[in-house]
Amino acid sequence: MSNIFSLSVSEIAEKIRNSDLNSVDLCKSYIEQINKFEKDVKAWAHFDKKLLLEKAEEADEHRRSGKSVGPLHGIPVALKDIIGTYDMPTECGTVLRKGKTESQNAEIVDLLKSAGALIMGKTNTSELAFLAPPETRNPHDYSRTPGGSSSGSAAVIASHMAPLSIGSQTGGSVIRPASYCGVVGYKPSYGLISRNGVLRTSYHLDHIGVFGKTVEDVALLAKVLIKKDSYDKATCLLYTSPSPRD
């Protein structure tokens, strides 16, 4: 299914909704890319092929049963390895957290799952999102850097190892790797997307960002994530309705 990589995520999602494509086959296409390129690109901190295919089969069965589906139903999404999850490690790029999981998902992970997305795994990041860079290489030239700190999140898009990914930015960590890897990276305004459950570097500078092949793709992903969260006060301030004028 090599032609799948020429489609936008919106087109893929529509094909899944119309039963012209199933999530298992979609995920297998990305697994093939991972098998081809991961040994050179080194974008993944954690990837569980078996778990992904199990979740894909569940998504297909859900759709076949006639139940309603979300905007990202059956679409695999990669997460930067500072985004908390309870069912896979969140190591934050450091040996100090090797194998550690969280007691619950980050808010954005729950939003992704509610939209029908499948969590693929974790992508490599600079240590603690600001120290030593990871081993990830630029997919276009293995001798060059993919940029950081969301190195793996940009690299998986550029190498077609994932259709969508999530990163973070405190001082350029979305827009820089997006530029270096030739993909679309979107860092929304402060407070639009909850950081609850994500490694904090700076309360006033940390942002969640998204990566994809096209502006349409990142807009679709961002729309799912933009939501008020009472556990991230920055979103509460942004979404507070202004007082009516006298």
Q: How would you describe each model-predicted region?
A:
Residues 1-54:
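An N-terminal boundary/leader segment
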Residues 59-75, 241:
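Immediate post-signal peptide segment of exported/extracytoplasmic ligand-binding proteins
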Residues 242-246:
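A short, hydrophobic C-terminal helix/tail in secreted or cell-surface proteins
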Residues 10-13, 28-31, 53, 57, ...:
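Predominant activation on well-ordered alpha-helical scaffold segments within soluble catalytic domains
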Residues 187-241:
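A short helix-breaking turn/cap at a secondary-structure junction
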Residues 72-208:
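Short glycine/serine-rich loop/turn segments
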Residues 19, 80, 214:
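Short, conserved phosphate/pyrophosphate- and ester-handling motifs at nucleotide-, phospho-/glycolipid
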